[in-house]
Amino acid sequence: MPSVMEKPSAGSGILSRSRAKTAPNGGQPHSEDDSSEEEHSHDSMIRVGTNYQAVIPECKPESPARYSNKELKGMLVWSPNHCVSDAKLDKYIAMAKEKHGYNIEQALGMLLWHKHDVEKSLADLANFTPFPDEWTVEDKVLFEQAFGFHGKCFQRIQQMLPDKVIPSLVKYYYSWKKTRSRTSVMDRQARRLGGRKDKEDSDELEEGRGAVSEGEPDTGDPKREPLPSRPLNARPGPGKKEVQISQYRHHPLRTRRRPPKGMYLSPEGLTAVSGSPDLANLTLRGLDSQLISLKRQVQSMKQTNSSLRQALEGGIDPLRPPEANTKFNSRWTTDEQLLAVQAIRRYGKDFGAIAEVIGNKTLTQVKTFFVSYRRRFNLEEVLQEWEAEQDGAPAAPVPTEEARRGAPVPATALEEDDEVQITSVSTSVPRSVPPAPPPPPPPTSLSQPPPLLRPPLPTAPTLLRQPPPLQQGRFLQPRLAPNQPPPPLIRPALAASRHSARPGPQPPPTLVGAPLEPPAPSL
């Protein structure tokens, strides 16, 4: 066969080559023509046989095992679709980035997972924590330390940063490398000062060595080695770095590396980590789980803050009570008149505030009421009291709880109050007024309502309500406490007697709104 016949020639060719190479060394003669012929025959040979054929595997049909043995291919992250517009896509990416911390690739992957349904993707963003692609301060410090130890060996750097992939490490390396050349003026000054200080220390060390060598020339000591002499014309080059490193050999504290700010090393932790090889991995896993839980808390806090921010943007309009659609009515009821007098006593001529207190009256209607009922309710005196309070006059003392509950008031205070009331009435009220029967004692369990509040309505209807008994005057009514204001709706006898035209007995004062009775015929 040709293959069998050609193989010895190939071997002889190889042997001839080796002989030709070893011939000059061994002194054996050789011929250049023979070697060229052998090389030509070796190159032109036909390579036939199993040694020169490729191994073709048998054909296998389609089966799941065929694809299981292959390497894991890349996963499709994003595929554009015409159903999602560019503006809508940009809005979705911005919302995913601001509210949930997703980057563009993660947000598009979520959108592709939900088949380009933006609403479902937005609802599902909060259910997942995005892979942390940001570099924290600890990650940056660890990267710098790992780069100082291992250089550009990113596989070893990844062992110190297991949550970072190698492409992310390479990307951060080049961005970090650009910032290394940027030094501020303060950094330059610090370097200069540090270089000067190191130079002074090295000079001091050299002087100390020279003094020792001059004072104690121990030439016979076998332990002491002579210092290597340096040539005078040494060029500054790679050896300069070695000189800088060697000058710190007598200062071990300067060569000691300290952990960055915020990180510390404890002997107990180092002992525990170096005790067993698995304990270090377990410790790192615990720290990773703790870091992941903290990041989840941060993400939940961000979501809570965003929801609260959305609630604040809505305003407080939904929380306001519904305003009742009050219809303005020009008719004044008894309760509204009472409330208006109390409001005048409280606000004076601030008719806008009085209209807001009443509720169903306009500013013009309140002004008309003040002009029309000025004499009827003696509003001038009410205004004088309000002006006296505004000028700084001492206000009436508020009755204590004991007086409200019906505690006995000292008799001297009541007698003085009654004397003042009688003298004030006697100077103004005519003598023709018949004496009124003593009023009934006030109930001890009841107390007057606070100002600007409507009095409680009786259980009976308004039409069937009976008027209260007639009273002689507000000055003769006993009070629970001194200087307590009188009821505002009782028509004063002073105003009635002053404005009455005909002499004779005058009718007693009546309540506002009560039906007027004709005077009894005089005998």
From Swiss-Prot:
Biased composition (Basic and acidic residues): 30-43
A UniProt-annotated Pfam family: Myb_DNA-binding
Recorded GO CC terms: nucleus
Compositionally biased region (Low complexity): 460-482
Record-annotated ELM2 domain positions: 44-129
GO terms under biological process: negative regulation of DNA-templated transcription
Gene Ontology terms, MF aspect: enzyme binding; transcription corepressor activity
Domain of life according to the entry: Eukaryota
CDD domains in UniProt: SANT
Location in chain, cross-link Glycyl lysine isopeptide (Lys-Gly) (interchain with G-Cter in SUMO2): K88
Pro residues biased stretches: 432-459, 504-523
Residue positions where Asymmetric dimethylarginine is found in the record: R479
Keyword terms: Coiled coil, Isopeptide bond, Methylation, Nucleus, Phosphoprotein, Repeat, Repressor, Transcription, Transcription regulation, Ubl conjugation
Modification type Phosphoserine: residues: S31, S35, S36, S63, S202
Location of the protein in the cell: Nucleus
Entry-linked Gene3D superfamilies: 1.20.58.1880, 4.10.1240.50, Homeodomain-like (1.10.10.60)
UniProt keyword Isomerase, yes or no: no
Residue intervals of the SANT domain: 130-181, 327-378
Tissue: Predominantly, but not exclusively, expressed in neural tissue. Strongly expressed in neural domains of the developing brain of the developing mouse CNS.
Claim: Coiled coil is one of the keywords in the record: yes
InterPro entries in the record: ELM2_dom, Homeodomain-like_sf, REST_helical, SANT/Myb, SANT_dom, Trans_reg/Corepressor
Function: May act as a component of a corepressor complex that represses transcription.
Family, per entry: Belongs to the CoREST family.
Name of the protein this chain belongs to: REST corepressor 2
Organism: Mus musculus (Mouse)
Gene this protein is translated from: Rcor2
